[in-house]
Amino acid sequence: GILTTLPQRNLRGAALSNTVDSHVWLDPNNAVRIAFFIATLRSQQYPENKAKYMANAKEFSQQMLQVSQQYESSNKAKPYWSYHDAYQYLERALNLKFAGALTDDPHIAPTAAQIKYLMDNRPKAQMCLLAETSASSSQYRKLNPVVFQPVDESMRGEDNFVTAWKKLASKTDKCVLSTQN
């Protein structure tokens, strides 16, 4: 395929065979490939606009790669938790290491067993928890100390992908860095 895909993972981070994590747009390289795919498709539909479509895709790719490269680091990968596992396509760009999720479905509350697993296997004393804004503090306060970072992997309400990706990456990076002491 034209996209780099990763398998879905269980709550503890193990890959699930024969699955695909559908959050592919969060990988900067995938975002660029999607832009060129759209430009190529639209160029076939409207050949008179081909130069404009390709120029737009090229400009997008330059902006996206410039924004994403500012996070690259040779330091040890930084652990984080998520409410549900939606951010693995950000991990390479931000040098993150998934340390577990509370639930595999954002609409289902975490189990006591999963909270205990996270507590017993926490890689840092204080952890960053990436979660939907709808997540209730009662669902994660047992994990304290945590830095709760509300995020929306769908980028709902945004009208510029590069800006939206940068906001998501910046929030994520700040949260994870704040727990590295």
Residue spans for each PLM region:
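Extracytoplasmic metal-acquisition and chelation regions
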Residues: 1-181
